[in-house]
Amino acid sequence: MTAKKSKSGRMTTALDLTTCEKLEHLQPIPKSRSSSITSIESEDGMMSTVLKPPPRRDFDDLMAFEGFIRDETWDNDFDYCHAHLTYYPPFIMKEVHNNLDKIKPTMNKNSRKFKRNLQHHIKKHLMHDMETCSGFKMDFNKVGMVETPTKVKWRFEDMGDHGFSKEEEDMYGRHWKLELEVTCNNENPLVEVDYKATPIM
């Protein structure tokens, strides 16, 4: 494995899905998270604590996106991260033999074949690989689909226990939800993936 420095300055290891470690047990919330908690006053004068949304990281490469998910688990921030990926799905790259000039104008959300292949890719590859990289169980349920003349957006959510017992989650205060949005458009085969892991307070 080769190590390289990420934009944040930390060392990262090249992604190999066969060597991703499982997250066996939860740990206490990182102390650095306290800087993301703020207090707000409600209309009735009561103070409540609110966690700021996690900062968004943008990617244009599937392996880098998956590597980020793995690194967040290594850094114990798996329940507080936001990643956005814009990419050509592997089934498109295979069909055009990695030559973007060969992309056909019909390769977009208006093509039933494209949507079918994309849904297969999401369920059988993207979600599976994200789970492998995270090291914990992801059980996404489809919670909606919105189609407009220019876009199709699928929304998925996981509010489960991620493979940990309620007692272990309670011991460390680690309850979190996962949200996944996948969007394609009517102009080209570029796909956008938005992944959020946020604590449930």
From Swiss-Prot:
Q: What GO cellular-component annotations does this UniProt entry give?
A: plasma membrane
Q: Which UniProt keywords apply?
A: Cell membrane, Membrane
Q: GO annotations under biological process?
A: energy reserve metabolic process
**UniProt name for this protein:** Respiratory growth induced protein 1
**Family statement drawn from the similarity comment of this UniProt entry:** Belongs to the RGI1 family.
Tell me what organism the protein belongs to. Meyerozyma guilliermondii (strain ATCC 6260 / CBS 566 / DSM 6381 / JCM 1539 / NBRC 10279 / NRRL Y-324) (Yeast)
Indicate the secretion signal residues.
Answer: none
Is Transcription regulation there in the keyword field? no
Report the locations given in the UniProt record: Cell membrane
What does the UniProt record say this protein does?
Answer: Involved in the control of energetic metabolism and significantly contribute to cell fitness, especially under respiratory growth conditions.
The organism's superkingdom is given as Eukaryota
InterPro entries (alphabetical): RGI1 (IPR022554), RGI1_sf (IPR038235)
Any coiled-coil regions, as ranges: none
The gene behind this protein is: RGI1
